[in-house]
Each structure stands twice: as structure tokens, then as C-alpha cells.
Amino acid sequence: MPPRGNGHASLPSSGPLHLVKMAVGAVDVDDLRRLRAQRHVERGESWVYTRNHPRRAEAVLDGGSLYWVVKGQIRARQRVTGFRKEHDDNGRAYCLILTDPEFVVTLPRAFRPFQGWRYLLSADVPKDAPGGPGGDFSMMPDHMLMELRELGLI
């Protein structure tokens, strides 16, 4: 399957607008879940730092999620609950993407590397993995998931 997504989401779409971000440093979904949970405990809330505030924030807040790319594939998502503008000690603006701490594991979907975040249309998001939040498929190796998907079993 060719990599999906080029960062452009200008075409109309039914459903909410989403964001996608690289999970830098995470080796798998469980590692990402642990890192995000640790940061949630340290901070008292779940958020992701970014320099640029999304111009289409309202469309994302209408049910959108932050999709996480782990090792070249979208693998999980967190619902976006808000955006908060902040300033650092030097007066530079940045944005916090507020997220629900709960993870939803998705079926793998290839995605090219990029920096920062990108918009993702509802038509381009991967399906949630069977089993719901934290799905039973989260422990399955990528190659097995891809094979089951190619066979039409998931």
C-alpha cells in the first residue's frame, strides 16, 4: 500500500477534521501510551506542544482526533478537547493541543514522515481497531495486522 497523506487537507470532507502528528521516540503503541500517560501524570492534563495554532481549530473541535504516527504508520488516536495559546519566557507564542488521555488503537495506515502536525480528512483516517479503546490488536505485531487487513479479515 502506498504511503497516505501529504499534509494537504483542503478538499471538503464529511465528518470532523483531524490532526496527525509523529510520535517521535515511541517504538510502538504501548510505548507511546506509556509516554503520554507519564506526561499526563506529570502535567495534570493531557496536551501536546506545537508552535503553530491550527487555523481550522473549530473544525477539529467538532469531534476531531489527534492521530499518532508510530514507525511510519498511523497506529492510535486521542480525541482533541481544546487548544490553548501560550507564550514562552521569550514572548514567543505556541499552542497546546489538549487531548483526552484515553487512547484508541487504530488499524495501521502508512503515512509519510513530516514535521509538526498536519490536517487529516475524515475520509483518510484509519478505522479503529476491533475491541474499542485500547483494542485487543494493540499487542499484535504490525506484519500480522497488515496480513489480516490484506485478507479482509479486519
Region roles according to the model:
Residues P3-L11, G15, L19, L107-P108:
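Phosphate/adenylate-binding glycine loop and adjacent helical scaffold
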Residues S13-E42:
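Eukaryotic proteins' extreme N-terminal regulatory segments
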Residues H18, D62, A93-C95:
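A generic structural signal for short beta-strands and their flanking turns/coil linkers
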Residues K21-V24, G63, W68, A76, ...:
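Generic structural "secondary-structure junction" signal
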Residues R34-R77:
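Short, well-structured hydrophobic secondary-structure segments
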Residues A37-Q38, K85, E150-L153:
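Short, intrinsically disordered, mixed-charge
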Residues R79-P126:
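Aromatic- and Lys/Arg-enriched surface recognition patch
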Residues G116-L121, P126-I154:
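Well-ordered alpha/beta subsegment
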